[in-house]
Amino acid sequence: MIIGIGSDLIDIRRVEKSIERFGERFTHRCFTEIERARSDKRANRAASYAKRFAAKEACSKALGTGIAQGVFWKDMGVVNLRSGKPTMLLSGGAALILESLLPAGHRPAIHLTITDDYPLAQAFVIIEALPESL
C-alpha cells in the first residue's frame, strides 16, 4: 500500500552558489556524513549534493510534513542498497513520522530515483507499507 509520494526539482546552480557562499556550514547543516563523503568524491560535486537535496525535499513531501513538524534535513539521508539502488535512511523526527503513518503489522519501503541533467536535478520518492510477513 502506498502511503506517500513526493517529487522535487532543483536548479544545481542554486546548490553551487550555496556551497560557494557557505561551504561546510551548508553541507554539514543539510547532509549526513555518508552523503558528504560520497558527494565530496564526485567530479560533479554540486550536482551530487543537488540530487541529495532534491531527495530530501521529495521525501519530506512523501511524509506529508515538508521540512517542518520536527523533520530536519539530516533526519533524511540518501544511502545505497547492496545492489547500488538508492533509498532513504530516516532518523529522528522523520523516522517518527514514518512510523506513525504505517498501519499495524507493516514495515516501510522507501523507493527513490534521482537524476540530473545540468542545470537541473530531480528526485522522486514513493513510501510503501509492506506486510511484515513479506
UniProtKB/Swiss-Prot annotation:
Keywords: Cytoplasm, Fatty acid biosynthesis, Fatty acid metabolism, Lipid biosynthesis, Lipid metabolism, Magnesium, Metal-binding, Transferase. Its cofactor is Mg(2+). Gene3D superfamilies: 4'-phosphopantetheinyl transferase domain (3.90.470.20). InterPro entries: 4-PPantetheinyl_Trfase_dom, 4-PPantetheinyl_Trfase_dom_sf, ACPS, Ppantetheine-prot_Trfase_dom. It catalyses: apo-[ACP] + CoA = holo-[ACP] + adenosine 3',5'-bisphosphate + H(+). The keyword Ion transport does not apply. Its main location: cytoplasm. Pfam families: ACPS (PF01648). GO terms for molecular function: holo-[acyl-carrier-protein] synthase activity; magnesium ion binding. Its EC number is 2.7.8.7. One of its GO terms (biological process) is fatty acid biosynthetic process. The keyword Lipid biosynthesis applies. Coiled coil: none annotated. It is found in: Cytoplasm. It is an enzyme of class 2 (transferase). Mg(2+) binds at D8, E57. GO terms for cellular component: cytoplasm. Transfers the 4'-phosphopantetheine moiety from coenzyme A to a Ser of acyl-carrier-protein. Belongs to the P-Pant transferase superfamily. AcpS family. HAMAP family: AcpS. This is Holo-[acyl-carrier-protein] synthase. It comes from Rhizobium johnstonii (strain DSM 114642 / LMG 32736 / 3841).
